[in-house]
Amino acid sequence: LDILDTFKLEKNLYEELEDMIYAEDSDYFLEDLIEQVLEHTEMPRFRLGSIEPGELSERLLKTYANPRMCPHFHMSIQSACSKTLKGMKRKYDAKLVEKSLKDIQRLVPNAYVGMDVIVGFPGETEEDFNETFQRLASLPWTRIHVFPYSDRPGTKSEEYCEKVDTVEKKRRASLLRELSSQRLREQALAQIGSLKDCILLSKYKDKSKVQVLSRDYWQMQLINLPEDFDLERIAEGEFKVKVVSFDESNASRMDGKLLAELVES
């Protein structure tokens, strides 16, 4: 299947199976869908989008034993404080957040785990924020996407009275982003020297700007490509790169170097 076929399949699966899987009386689960797609298609890569802790079953994690499942998770946790999660009307608590992250580490070791976290939700006290911060600091993950809370018209939280001051929201966001940057740097440095299967993200005439994406969601810039290298040779399918350095001027990027022997194959 080419990329277009993959997008069509994804769209059709979503439209046809969404109601069947998420209906209250449904006997079907996300795990059923993934297992069926893995069994009945030959698509080489599958990556799940945003997922909540309550959806992360052991059965789902065991599907990652299949090499076609990309070891990358985007966790929509929002907070790691049970009181704050209750205020957000989430169907899980901090214990389940903790369990889900530990389960990923246990069953899909070395996976890239990104998370969405909101700071300054109405009613979030300093103690609540510190609980989230300390809990996350002790858990396994790769990166946090931090969002200061803002009112959205028509939502229940818009009516809440205990709003957090804008300056305080920015302070909390800054602290979490610093924690995230430190963790991302540690994880990135641990990748140096490893070989990764990648796909091409962009094609530039300037060979110093070529971006690739690994199965475990590390975005890298290829370096030392010859000026006469034809990118069409790697435009379809996967190829290997060797991670050689981490550019600390941009914490979201790593530098990779193609393995010459694989490029020539």
For the regions a protein language model found, what residue spans apply to each?
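Conserved SAM/AdoMet-binding glycine-rich loop
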Residues: 1-126
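Glycine-rich, charged/polar anion/phosphate-binding loops
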Residues: 33, 59-60, 130-134, 182-185, ...
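Structural beta-strand/beta-sheet cores of well-ordered domains, especially the beta-sheet scaffolds
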Residues: 44-49, 71, 111, 142-145, ...
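Generic beta-strand/beta-sheet core signal
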Residues: 49-51, 76-78, 116-118, 147-149, ...
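Thr-Gly-centered strand-to-loop micro-motif
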Residues: 51, 144, 223-225
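Short, charged low-complexity intrinsically disordered segments located at boundaries
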Residues: 63-69, 91-94, 132-133, 201-213
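A structural motif corresponding to the C-terminal lobe/cap of the Radical SAM core domain
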Residues: 71, 83-199
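Terminal RNA-binding accessory module
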Residues: 159-265
